Amino acid sequence: MTDSFGFAEEALEQEVDLENNPTARVEELKARVLKENVNDPEDIMLLIMESFTIQEIVPEAGKFYTFIYNAKTPNISYDQHPLIACVEIFRWGFRGLNFHWQNYRNYTWEEIPGQLMVVEFQELDELLALQYGKFILNN
């Protein structure tokens, strides 16, 4: 069952102290970013792809994901590395709350060149702190 925002209730009910209980893969990722002095969004996304090995082809409403996206619509700005909460699935793709944009966005299947990396609720703040969103104007 989902609430009016499209999130699974159990995801919203989780109360996790992110500072004291981050997942091991995020700690490893943060350590690599610091050790390798990585600050380019492309390079950070590559490290995320190496660390986040649980992947899905089709998202599930109420779950969190990050992935690479190449928009087809001309003259729009888009995030090439979205971090989203999936809220709806359609034949053409899905809709998600993009945490980098802080807005709902539509994602079509054809514009996702790979798979969606599953993100756990308790990893969201840590990933947002990495600032790996890559905002592009599609010409």
Over which residues does each language-model region extend?
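Short coil-to-beta transition motif at edge beta-strands of beta-rich domains
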Residues: 55-75
